Amino acid sequence: DDLIKECERYNIALITLVSVTTPKERVKKLVKHAKGFIYLLASIGITGTKSVEEAILQDKVKEIRSFTNLPIFVGFGIQNNQDVKRMRKVADGVIVGTSIVKCFKQGNLDIIMKDIEEIFKK
């Protein structure tokens, strides 16, 4: 409650994270105070690992939408262009983190930009 109050005080959107394993009643409570968007975790485990099945994510998106009109973004386990394309069918947006960090570790700006463009190409 203190965190929510402080975020509201400073006009900061506290992004709510929901996993495919989060029980429905917990989802309902989590999205009640959500601002900005809902971050749906597309994998179980650490970031950058394999995503769960698309059908499971679709079901979870439907469940979340039954409680909120906020946009739903999918992240965790989004590794390449194919993942981005699949997730855009499921959710309002896609969050790519680890794959972009890996691109930056290569150090060559031209390669970085090419790799990032490859991830997001239509």
List each model region and its residues.
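Active-site-adjacent beta->alpha loops and helix N-cap segments on the catalytic face
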Residues: 1-9, 23-29, 47-62, 81-84, ...
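Glycine-enriched alpha-helix->loop->beta-strand junction motifs that scaffold or abut catalytic
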Residues: 6-15, 32-38, 89-93
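Hydrophobic positions in alpha-helices of CheY-like receiver
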Residues: 7, 64, 87, 116-119
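Short beta-strand/loop segments at the ligand-binding rim of alpha/beta enzyme cores
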Residues: 7-17, 65-75
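Glycine- and other small-residue-rich loops at beta-strand/loop junctions that grip anionic moieties
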Residues: 15-19, 49, 53, 76
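Extended, intrinsically disordered, low-complexity segments
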Residues: 20-21, 114-122
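Catalytic cores of alpha/beta
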Residues: 22-32, 74, 78-94
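Glycine-rich phosphate-binding active-site loops on the catalytic face of alpha/beta enzymes
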Residues: 40-48, 77-78, 90-109
